Swiss-Prot record:
One of its GO terms (cellular component) is plasma membrane. Keywords: Cell membrane, Disulfide bond, G-protein coupled receptor, Glycoprotein, Membrane, Olfaction, Receptor, Sensory transduction, Transducer, Transmembrane, Transmembrane helix. It comes from Homo sapiens. Belongs to the G-protein coupled receptor 1 family. The gene is OR5C1. Odorant receptor. It is found in: Cell membrane. It is a multi-pass membrane protein. The chain crosses the membrane at residues 30-50, 59-79, 104-124, 144-164, 201-221, 242-262, 276-296. Glycans are attached at N5. This is Olfactory receptor 5C1. Disulfide bonds join C101-C193.
């Protein structure tokens, strides 16, 4: 029984110690003061965007349906990591229970993969809108939009389940100190005393498949969009299509650039200290930038914001 208990303890420790981003107290305070407003901008900006789309009837189109769900994803995405990271920056020793670590990994990985799939769905939506504007609402029916959203969520959940299950079947007898500020896959593989070759292979294969398939879908969609824009006779239509597509491509480039850097590498090239800053970028910074990217160049969103502001702060003006 004692041997059995020892084996179980080696496989499933009660908790992990999160080493965080840095040991220096002054840097941790500086990071807290920097990351707190970034997280609040991410949370309030994304929730505000989703609420704005819900409140304004003019934004009840397939394009804004996907944008609202992307905003909700980003709010959840940053909230899966941000609050605990901020609290841990002010603690002398940060820990996370074993089951909470597994849950955090599942939620974060699932949301990240879901967002990749959703970005591909948004590219297809833009293609249909620009290619066949008169048939746009018919082609992008509510049923199709829900199917694309459901497929994105299912793909993310399956991928996260595989990674989380295989990661937490490993033994962690070497160390319980995770060289990161959250339960990410590479730092956990680094402290396992089991053979992690299958995990590394599946991490590369699944992430590679999802990212390659979605990037291919985005590339093909924008290839057709470029062809349609070139043949447009309306300068205003071309400008609007380029503006909308440019916002989406900016979000795609930031998201995929950091994910490829983080996960599509062999374990021998992992530099966990460098990866921590990349992790901060894609867990907090990117979600905070997406509302700005999609709103600053979008006349419909800016007009909806202006009217909503007038309605709540200048009731007489908003009713005119």
């Amino acid at each position: 029984m004692n041997s059995e208990n020892l084996t179980r303890a080696a496989v499933a420790p009660a908790e992990f110690v999160l080493l965080g981003i840095t040991n220096r107290w002054d840097l941790r305070v500086a990071l807290f003061l920097t990351c707190l407003p970034v997280y609040l901008v991410s949370l309030l900006g994304n929730m505000g965007m989703a609420l704005l789309i819900r409140m304004d009837a003019r934004l009840h189109t397939p394009m804004y349906f996907f944008l609202a769900n992307l905003s909700l994803l980003d709010a959840c995405y940053s909230s899966a990591i941000g609050p605990k990271m901020l609290v841990d920056l002010l603690l002398p020793r940060a820990t996370i229970p074993y089951t909470a670590c597994a849950l955090q990994m599942f939620v974060f990985a699932g949301l990240a993969d879901t967002e990749c799939c959703l970005l591909a769905a948004m590219a297809y939506d833009r293609y249909v809108a620009i290619r066949n504007p008169l048939l746009y609402t018919t082609a992008m029916s509510q049923r199709l939009c829900l199917a694309l959203l459901g497929a994105s969520g299912l793909g993310g959940a399956v991928s996260a389940f595989v990674h989380t299950t295989l990661t937490f079947r490993l033994s962690f007898c070497r160390s319980r100190k995770i060289n990161s500020f959250f339960c990410d896959i590479p730092p956990l593989l680094a402290i396992s005393c089991s053979d992690t070759s299958l995990n590394e292979l599946l991490l590369f294969a699944i992430c590679g498949f999802i990212q390659t398939a979605t990037v291919l879908a985005i590339t093909v969609s924008y290839g057709f969009i470029a062809g349609a824009v070139i043949h447009m006779r309306s300068v205003e239509g071309s400008r609007r299509a380029a503006s909308t597509g440019g916002s989406h491509l900016t979000a795609v480039a930031m998201m995929y650039g950091t994910l490829i850097f983080m996960y599509l590498r062999p374990s021998s090239s992992y530099a966990l200290d460098t990866d921590k800053m990349a992790s901060v970028f894609y867990t907090l910074v990117i979600p905070s930038l997406n509302p700005l990217i999609y709103s600053l160049r979008n006349k419909e969103v800016k007009e909806a914001l202006r009217q909503t502001w007038s309605r709540f702060h200048c009731p007489g003006q908003g009713s005119q």
